[in-house]
Amino acid sequence: MRLCTYSVEPGAPRLGAECGGAVLDLARYSHLHDGLRLPADMLGLIDAGPDAWRHATELCRRFSAELPTHDLAQDAEAGLAYPADRVRRHAPIVRPRKDVIGLGQNYSAHAKELKNAVPPAPIYFTKPPTAVIGTDEPIPYPQGLTTRFDWEVELGVVIGVGGRNIVQARALDHVFGYTVFNDVSARDLQFRTSQWFKGKSLDGTCPMGPVIVTADEVADPQALRLTLTVNGVRKQDGHTRDMIFSVAQIIADLSAGMTLEPGDAISTGTPEGVGDGRTPPEYLKPGDIVEAEVEQIGVLRNPVR
């Protein structure tokens, strides 16, 4: 499934699924067709567990099969489904319950471009829920706080089944789905001390989306191309096979002695091509359009304002 959080004015954000050219309201469609009501938000669906995920998948298949005979205008009037271009997309998890966990320098070429040694163990930091925004939302330029405002396209992982001391061989069984993150970073704040948190945590510096693609549709998270453009010019072009620590290794390492919970989000690091590693350096400025893309997931687009 390609799951999103959408809204239609003046309504509040709700859980949806992309089906063809439509966005299906899973909770309403489920209630109408089988008397059950799936949760109306992403975290609720994640918490509901694998049986609910399978039910949602079956609803999407049913709706997709019926779509050629549907009157989408009538569906929209009933609040069941909408043409994709009629809805606003939010971050798939509008307000994470906890900080997003980030990885630093998880691609060797990226570590080298920042003149750092390849790390012997994963480097973790976090980004607070207040940093999370969705596709097409503006990234606020922090005037007066930074002159080195940088981009980072990353594969995002959302945990579906919690656990502690998860073994690497079973780690991917704990994944709910995958998304795109842009780990926007204020480099001068990031590197003023050895602790990166402030430079990674400014409001609006964790764009996420446009969807979460469920794990059953991504055969291998280490087989995905990542790209990023600024104003249509390609800046990053990498591949998840080049991660130093794979998704499975990250989950196993993180969960060693530390419980991962459903809904936890992990941003797995960026390939080379960031602005701070260029000669001369390049940085984001107001008016720029940033598009971060991960193969099989989609394009996360944000203006800088």
Q: Where are the regions a protein language model picked out?
A:
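Structural signature of FAD isoalloxazine-binding scaffolds in flavoprotein oxidoreductases
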Residues: A17-E18, A117-T135, W151, K285-Q296
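Short, structured patches in soluble enzyme cores that scaffold and shape functional sites
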Residues: S7, Q105, K127-P129, D136, ...
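N-terminal non-catalytic cap/leader segment that marks the start of a structured domain
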Residues: M1-P122, E291
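Short acidic-glycine loop/turn motifs at beta-strand connectors
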Residues: V8-P10, E18-A22, I159-V161, V230-G232, ...
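Residue-level recognition of short, solvent-exposed, well-ordered loop/turn junctions
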Residues: G102, D150-E152, E261, K285-P286
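Short catalytic-site patches enriched in acidic/histidine residues
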Residues: I123-P142, V161-R164, G204-V211, P271-G275
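Catalytic-pocket segment enriched in acidic/His residues
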Residues: P13, T57, P68, Y82, ...
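A generic local secondary-structure boundary/capping motif
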Residues: C4, R89-P92, K112-K115, P140-F149, ...
